[in-house]
Amino acid sequence: TLFSALCHETLVQHGEEALEQLCAQVRQGKFLLSDTMPWYGETFYLPKPIAASESTEEVETTLRKKVKKLTWIPVLEFDRYARSLHEGHFTPDEQPESFGTHYEQTKAAVPMQGDTMPYQVGLFRFAPDCGLYFICGFTEDGQDEDLEYLLDWLGATGIGGKVSSGYGKFHVADKIYLNEPFDEQTEWMYHALSSEHAPYLLLSTSLPQADEMDHALEGASFQLVRRSGFMASDHVETPLKKKTQYALSAGSVLQNRYQGALYDVGLSDVHPAYRYSKPIFMGVTL
């Protein structure tokens, strides 16, 4: 994940004390991250809210299937989509069928002894004028510069599971301060992020703490996503398995906020394995 990559890069660039400072900021809610979300041209997209339609209007089958398949909603079409859940219907404006292409590439594993073994690597290439963005919340001066520095290094080294093969490189196209909105789209996002009125659209895959769970799920519409995986470590030769958790997916709609946590999901005593699970909410009308 992005947070795991930021932790690793912080450790490489600044050492253990800086890493613990970053984790402390997260625990205290002073550094928050959304999931990554797509953009196309000048348009930012939000996860389609997990909310049932109450509209009784008859909709053409082709259009109904097209809307059902949508995963992302343009920011400036969000309110129109929300209204269509109660009356009328939603016709998506022109947007890409997808933001890129999944494909496979054959690579070769060359052992010290024995035959070369081919294997497949799954890849994703973004379409022209498409990419990913995320929202980050800060409370202290200088945090944005620290993040930008880490992202510049990460862009050069890569992010993801195939960095050693040269994949996962990126560059930061722009940095926008949403508390200084400059057009209708950023104005909408700023007000939604500042809103303290339910319902709330969840932008971060995250898990309430045990004592928050019941209250957080009251009246909520949500999906669960399985979070598991392995932890790479310089202290052991093979990756270590991490605890499996089931978290609320981005796009879940909640009536009550929660704090979430930075969970230690390590299954060994080698060192902690942190999983980011703090939410960012948008107050929306649904």
Where are these regions (language model features)?
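Conserved active-site/ligand-binding neighborhood in enzyme cores
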Residues: 1-286
